[in-house]
From Swiss-Prot:
Protein name: Uncharacterized protein MJ1337
Origin: domain of life: Archaea
Biological classification of the source: Archaea, Methanobacteriati, Methanobacteriota, Methanomada group, Methanococci
Length: 231
């Protein structure tokens, strides 16, 4: 995750990155330290990723920057019913179903009639999500990537389709970090969402991935993917 940000910003000759990380074996003490640090943030853009949801703490963070959430960041936002305070969510289809289920406390507990929605029914799920509190922007990661602004689908990215990318851990994280980095270097948000999806897919092609490919190999291909996509 951090590596993907650094590689993306390196392409733009940007080096001003701050990282908040701490040890946590599941008891939540490390996450509490991160929540406390987030109260003092004065940057323009913040990404909240792996963190243990804590309703009282997530409500206390500084929401003046653009707050982008993936994984635990989204779960915490949903639990606290403050998704609309965030700028961007990046769920996969399973997480999208979780966000749409007002009774689910975790993606593992999504009700069957929602969790059985497949990729072809993503637009219906997006519509259901936005009946609850959601951010202005969203990217849904899947066989087709959807970029969304205020419930409206603004782009669908399907190519290149590299099947092996689906079984390599961390490829959803690289998308989050590429998109966030593009926004941070002043790409317009809608353009950054679409470009990020295209670049992330291009990584699989450039790295010639297979199920044994390591995420570091994919991250190292980011500068070339940026060059090929932005030229």
């Amino acid at each position: 995750m951090i590596g993907a940000v650094l590689k993306t910003l390196e392409y733009f000759d940007e080096k001003d990155v701050k990282v908040i990380t701490t040890g946590d074996i599941g008891e939540g003490d490390g996450s509490l330290k991160i929540y406390d640090a987030l109260k003092e943030i004065d940057d323009d853009l913040v990404i909240i990723h792996y963190i243990k949801p804590k309703i009282s703490k997530i409500r206390e963070i500084n929401f003046s920057p653009k707050i982008i959430a993936d994984a635990g960041g989204m779960y915490a936002a949903k639990a606290a019913n403050i998704g609309d305070k965030f700028y961007l969510f990046l769920p996969d289809v399973g997480e999208l179903a979780f966000l749409a289920d007002e009774k689910a406390s975790h993606p593992a507990y999504v009700r069957g009639f929602i969790s059985e929605i497949d990729d072809n029914e993503v637009p219906k799920l997006i519509e259901r999500d936005y009946k609850l509190k959601m951010p202005k922007y969203m990217v849904v990661k899947g066989e087709t990537d959807y970029t969304i602004r205020e419930e409206k689908i603004i782009d669908k990215i399907k190519e290149p389709k590299i099947k092996a990318m689906e079984c390599i851990g961390g490829t959803g994280d690289t998308l989050t970090e590429i998109v966030s980095s593009l926004i941070s270097v002043d790409f317009k948000t809608e353009e950054a969402l679409s470009l990020g999806c295209k670049i992330n897919r291009k990584l699989g092609e450039i790295a010639n991935v297979n199920p044994n490919t390591q995420i570091t190999e994919i991250i190292n291909a980011i500068p070339k993917a940026l060059e090929n996509t932005l030229k």
